């Protein structure tokens, strides 16, 4: 699947779950389960509850996402 197939959205981290997984509420109100992308994990980017993040969703499963950017 190419990068163009992903849906990019922004949201807010509302809960931290085990294994670097987070519950994120998107700007449209939907809640998804998101994990950290590999580059963020490699560079030790810390994500806390309340952070604004950019996530990528796949069109096949809109309940799971990947966190690709943490806003300041």
From Swiss-Prot:
Signal peptide: none
Matching CDD domains: S1_IF1
Superkingdom field: Bacteria
Main location: cytoplasm
Entry's transmembrane regions: none
GO CC annotation terms, alphabetical: cytosol
Keyword RNA-binding annotated: yes
Cellular compartment(s): Cytoplasm
Keywords: Cytoplasm, Initiation factor, Protein biosynthesis, RNA-binding, rRNA-binding
Annotated S1-like domain residues: 1-72
InterPro entries in alphabetical order: NA-bd_OB-fold (IPR012340), RNA-binding_domain_S1_IF1 (IPR006196), S1_domain (IPR003029), TIF_IF1 (IPR004368)
Database matches in SMART domains: S1
Gene Ontology MF: a single term: ribosome binding
The protein's role, per its UniProt record: One of the essential components for the initiation of protein synthesis. Stabilizes the binding of IF-2 and IF-3 on the 30S subunit to which N-formylmethionyl-tRNA(fMet) subsequently binds. Helps modulate mRNA selection, yielding the 30S pre-initiation complex (PIC). Upon addition of the 50S ribosomal subunit IF-1, IF-2 and IF-3 are released leaving the mature 70S translation initiation complex.
Subunit structure: Component of the 30S ribosomal translation pre-initiation complex which assembles on the 30S ribosome in the order IF-2 and IF-3, IF-1 and N-formylmethionyl-tRNA(fMet); mRNA recruitment can occur at any time during PIC assembly.
NCBIfam families linked to this entry: infA
Family assignment from sequence similarity: Belongs to the IF-1 family.
Name recorded for this polypeptide: Translation initiation factor IF-1
